[in-house]
Amino acid sequence: ENQLRNITKTFATKLIKKGFISPAINVPAPDVGTSEREMGWIKDVYKSLRPEDINYRACVTGKPRHGGGIAGRTEATGRGIEEVIREFFRNKEEVKKAKLNENLKDNRIVIQGFGNVGRHLAYELYNRDNAKIIAIGEYNGILYNENGIDINKLIECVLFKKTIENNDLGKFIKNPKEIVEVECDILVPAALEGVINKDNVEKVKTKLIVEAANGPIDPASDKILFNKGVTVLPDIYVNAGGVVVSYFEWVKNLSHIRFGRMEKRYQEHKLLELIKLIEKTTNTKTDPELIK
């Protein structure tokens, strides 16, 4: 951890000194291999190098809540993707065109990646939509169960063992690259870019691809999938949930007022005015202890 902290802080120092990071220029956020911890380190470096900037917390988003972060940022991308999928299934005409089953829960889902995005997406799909997730892919292999994986149990296993392997939730396949070749109705690449390319695009057997990762399909493969009739929901729309919540965090840091504070004050002021009106009308006084 110390080595990672030193690397992060050194890199952040160089970017900040060159003017590449500030609340008004570039505002980084977590991605593959990083978390709120690294964002907190970057914020600390910015504060030490720019002590005069009162908006220093807005130099980066995805921070820990105690460091100026916002509730819900960690799971925002995954939850946003689930909302996108739900919205797609509300459009029955598009669902029919994609040759999918009308109800989301009746479709087989494969998710590549079980990190921050994939894990929260799987959790929402499983618990909110009763979805059938038949395969989860990670760096070391694939967990497959044609009857559907118990996502809640898998999350417990991963938190304890740090791997999707060594459990009784399904069959483990040791070739992680085969995840995009698993036959399914909905394929969700939620890890790295370029996972669907000229080497495997012809082996993709799905009806709908939801681009949870950034650029998981290369341009040439995108054309091939289009010609095959595969519906693709683009990453710029699908994974915007994280960016949206990052914006709210940024605004909160710039305004220096947490969300709900102004509304609370407004409601308090409105209540006091109502009490004054009642007192004036009835010629009575309200116990001050009741107003507190």
Listing of model-derived features with the role each one plays in the protein:
Residues 4-23, 43-54, 85-93, 116, ...:
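Structural signal for hydrophobic packing residues in well-ordered secondary-structure cores
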Residues 25-28, 53-56, 135-138, 188-189, ...:
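General beta-strand structural signal in soluble alpha/beta enzymes
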Residues 2-6, 33-37, 41, 72, ...:
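Conserved active-site and cofactor/substrate-binding residues in soluble primary-metabolism enzymes
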Residues 88, 207-292:
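Adenosine-phosphate binding glycine-rich loop
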